[in-house]
């Protein structure tokens, strides 16, 4: 998987300054998907509000189903001040079927039940990427 912010190609598992994500550009996510299949794409923060106290794990920063149906628009990383580095996961899941967006019952971005969503929708991990950032 390749992830770009503006012209910056991110490197898997690297740390980036928070300002990079406030450039006004959406992330450009590239993966070798099969155009005949359907995928779910998400970006989640597992360290919300902090790695030592992740009570809002997982915070959704992007959720797209069926290749192009947006459930949650992109929201740039926004970790609390002095909460330490946050790990942001960019995930692409292959879907076994088309997901009915009206059957998705997610009320808010924090406390996303990641495991339940994957199991309920019979998703298979296809590609993954992780970057870190923090607010000092």
Model-found features: residue ranges?
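N-terminus-centered regions that define maturation/targeting leaders and the start
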Residues: 1-136
